[in-house]
Structure formats: structure tokens, C-alpha cells
Amino acid sequence: MKLIIGIGGVTNGGKTTLTNSLLKALPNCCVIHQDDFFKPQDQIAVGEDGFKQWDVLESLDMETMLSTVQAWVKDPHKFARAHGVSLQSGASDTHVLLLEGFLLYSYRPLVDLYSQRYFLTVPYEECKRRRRSRTYMVPDPPGLFDGHVWPMYQKYRREMEQDGVEVVYLDGMKSPEGLFHQVLEDIQNRLLNTS
């Protein structure tokens, strides 16, 4: 059995923390981080708002990300070995792929591949506070959060909802442990009910 689980949502919402916890707990589990598919900095457009457009779908090489997912679907054993994942012998017929990122549900060719889609949310003020506390390879220029990051999050979330993409909303204000146990239990139930 193969499951593809999406862990999407707002920037600094807890996606990576949740994904890393699930990765350790699930059998034969691999992860693909959307952030690994950013185009080179010199290919990122500057928008009318004056900011580099990092928070738009066009800043990502989604075709390559889709190809990577398709490689896992075709042969999860080979994919796991190539990515240094040790397969558990007792669960050899169970494979889980976690996709983690902020625009997972905006690229139509990926949307229907998910077995389950989660979407982390946090309120504006908390998101802004968390964003300020992080250090990025390309530092945020003044005004980026209010002028670009938050408006793009709102735009893509609205489009996702208008397109009818079904997600399980998760409250990113809950403790990381609480979110982990909620999602792990959900995935384990899905594995039990489909085996």
C-alpha cells in the first residue's frame, strides 16, 4: 500500500516540525520538501510590489517536483534506497510519502495524487512573529511579510478553497506534540482501514 500525505499551509505554521516527527514514526516513510524545488535566485521575478516573488507558484520548479513524486510512485523501494531510507521488513508492503510545502495544493497535476491533505493555519500576528524569529538564506527585506508573503498566502488559500480542494485544517497554535499525535493517529487509521 502506498500513501501520499500532504503537509501544507501557511509559512511558519509548523509544517516542517510536523513532517519531521511523522517521518520518524511512520514505516517506510520518505519526504519531499517543496522548498528544495525553488528556482535559482536569478530566475525569481520582481513583482509590481517591488519584492522578489518567492511566494508564488512560478518561483518553484513544480515539473521537477512532480517527476520526483512520480519516481516514488513508480518504485518506492528504489526511491527509499536512493534517499538513504531504511525499509522496515515487517512493513515492506506499506510505503508513505510526505510532501511538505506552502503551495502544495496549487499545482493541479499534484492535487489528485494525495491520499490525504493537511493544511496548517496560524493567525496573522503569530505568523508574522514566527517569521521574524527565523533566519533565512535570503533575508526578508523590510515590509516583505505585509507586502508580499501574507497577501500571497491569502491569495493561494482562497484559490485552493474556490477550487474545492479538500483539506483537513490543522490549528498551528496547538502544541507540536498534539498536532503530531492527531495526524499520526489519522494516518495509522487510514493504513489499518485500507490494508
Curated annotation (Swiss-Prot):
PANTHER family with a match to the protein in the record? URIDINE KINASE
State whether it acts alone or in a complex, and with which partners, per the record.
Monomer. Interacts with ITGB1 alone or when associated with alpha-7, but not with alpha-5.
Q: What does this protein do?
A: Catalyzes the phosphorylation of nicotinamide riboside (NR) and nicotinic acid riboside (NaR) to form nicotinamide mononucleotide (NMN) and nicotinic acid mononucleotide (NaMN). Reduces laminin matrix deposition and cell adhesion to laminin, but not to fibronectin. Involved in the regulation of PXN at the protein level and of PXN tyrosine phosphorylation. May play a role in the regulation of terminal myogenesis.
Family the entry assigns: Belongs to the uridine kinase family. NRK subfamily.
- What is the protein name given in its UniProt record? Nicotinamide riboside kinase 2
What tissue specificity is annotated for this entry? Expressed in skeletal muscle (at protein level).
Q: Which UniProt keywords apply?
A: ATP-binding, Kinase, Magnesium, Metal-binding, Nucleotide-binding, Pyridine nucleotide biosynthesis, Transferase
Summarize the record's induction comment. Answer: Down-regulated during myoblast differentiation.
A single GO BP term for this record reads: negative regulation of myoblast differentiation
Q: GO molecular function, one example?
A: ATP binding
Q: List, alphabetically, the InterPro entries matched.
A: P-loop_NTPase
Q: Which residues bind Mg(2+)?
A: 16, 35
Q: Which reaction does it catalyse?
A: beta-nicotinamide D-riboside + ATP = beta-nicotinamide D-ribonucleotide + ADP + H(+); beta-D-ribosylnicotinate + ATP = nicotinate beta-D-ribonucleotide + ADP + H(+)
**Listed EC numbers:** 2.7.1.22, 2.7.1.173
List of residues binding ATP:
9-17, 130, 134-136, 174-176
Q: Which domain of life is it from?
A: Eukaryota
Q: Where is the active site?
A: 35
Got a GO cellular component term for this one? cytosol
Pathway annotation from the record: Cofactor biosynthesis; NAD(+) biosynthesis
| Residues the record lists as binding substrate | 35-38, 54-55, 131, 136-137
Specify one Pfam family: AAA_18
